[in-house]
């Protein structure tokens, strides 16, 4: 259980860090030559990894070094499947966190996003992590403009209750129960206690045995749906990075005006794919209005695609905070239902085993 909270917290931190970097300026040649100690974003392609743990990223007009030591490095999973549903599905795989020594095994020309502090080291400006100043590296494929949505959508664990800590917890629990059973076994008065302890060793296997395995399958489906709703919640909140309350206007890091317009009907451009939907159209309620986010045009026009490729551009089927509250409620309902099904399956299997033992 503790591992589940740690895993969920780590992915929440990943998404928050990416959101914070969206408000930082993009690094260009002028800033690279004149500033240090400030936080920037930069994108390019993997050029090389040198022996001193330095990654070189080649952009359009600039090549910058990145100190891999201490960097939080992730590989974004490729989008699987096709069709409209796959666009919004966070997928079953979370971004993979990798060690610095695995970076050199990645394909040459892989796309890279880096965000963090630009420091001066050995007379060279370099992206580097330091205490209180994290450095985020993301390797990805596909269009740059899709990275922000994909990172927030997929940046969550498949199932927090099965994580890297879980196998160790199960082994330690099993060893403790075996030790408990062996300590009580020589005492005739505690034979039942010893048998119960031995039986408890196999409780983690109960969800996978018949007939309760059907409940486990249903549990996994409900849990995946809850994960999708949590992704929708975070996607609905994406525009709030730039606009407090989801309305009004603000200025992007590149001094471009950013804002939203509220419409009764979905613009025709969206039907042709020119305005991406951040959440499926089917999620809209009749009383809600469409909110289109992007760079602000002249008064009376609709927002258009910002020059900053990481700025959110798209339409939401409702007000962001209201959508976020709706999806978190749905996610909680599905998670509770999933747990009830799983526990029901375990109880059914326990009853099944008890009946078999009684017949023997």
PLM region spans:
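OB-fold and OB-like single-stranded nucleic-acid-recognition modules
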Residues: 1-360
């Amino acid at each position: 259980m503790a591992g589940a909270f740690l895993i969920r917290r780590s992915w929440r931190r990943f998404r928050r860090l990416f959101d914070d970097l969206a408000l930082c300026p993009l690094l260009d040649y002028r800033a690279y030559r004149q500033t240090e100690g400030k936080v920037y974003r930069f994108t390019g392609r993997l050029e090389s990894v040198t022996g001193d743990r330095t990654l070189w990223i080649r952009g359009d007009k600039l090549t910058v070094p990145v100190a891999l030591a201490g960097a939080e490095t992730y590989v974004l999973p490729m989008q699987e499947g096709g069709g409209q549903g796959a666009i919004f599905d966070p997928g079953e795989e979370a971004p993979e966190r990798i060690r610095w020594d695995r970076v050199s095994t990645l394909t040459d020309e892989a796309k890279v996003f880096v965000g963090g502090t630009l420091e001066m080291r050995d007379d060279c400006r370099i992206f580097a992590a330091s205490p209180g100043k994290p450095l985020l590296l993301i390797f990805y494929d596909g269009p740059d403009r899709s990275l922000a949505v994909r990172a927030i959508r997929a940046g969550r664990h498949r199932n927090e209750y099965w994580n890297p800590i879980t196998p160790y917890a199960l082994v330690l629990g099993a060893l403790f129960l075996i030790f408990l059973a062996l300590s009580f076994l020589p005492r005739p008065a505690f034979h039942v206690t010893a048998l119960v302890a031995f039986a408890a060793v196999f409780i983690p296997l109960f969800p996978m045995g018949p007939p309760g395995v059907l409940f486990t399958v249903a549990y996994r489906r409900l849990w995946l749906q809850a994960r999708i709703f949590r992704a929708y919640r975070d996607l609905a909140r994406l525009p709030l990075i730039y606009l407090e309350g989801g309305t009004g206007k603000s200025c992007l890091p590149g001094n471009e005006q950013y804002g939203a317009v509220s419409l009764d009907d979905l613009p025709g451009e969206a039907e042709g794919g020119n305005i991406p939907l951040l959440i499926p159209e089917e999620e809209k309620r009749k009383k809600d209005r469409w909110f289109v986010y992007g760079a602000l045009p002249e008064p009376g026009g609709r927002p258009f695609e910002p020059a900053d490729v990481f700025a959110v551009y798209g339409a939401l089927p409702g007000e962001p905070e209201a959508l976020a509250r709706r999806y978190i409620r749905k996610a909680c309902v599905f998670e509770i239902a999933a747990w009830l099904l799983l526990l029901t399956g375990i109880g059914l299997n326990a009853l099944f085993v008890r009946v078999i033992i009684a017949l023997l």
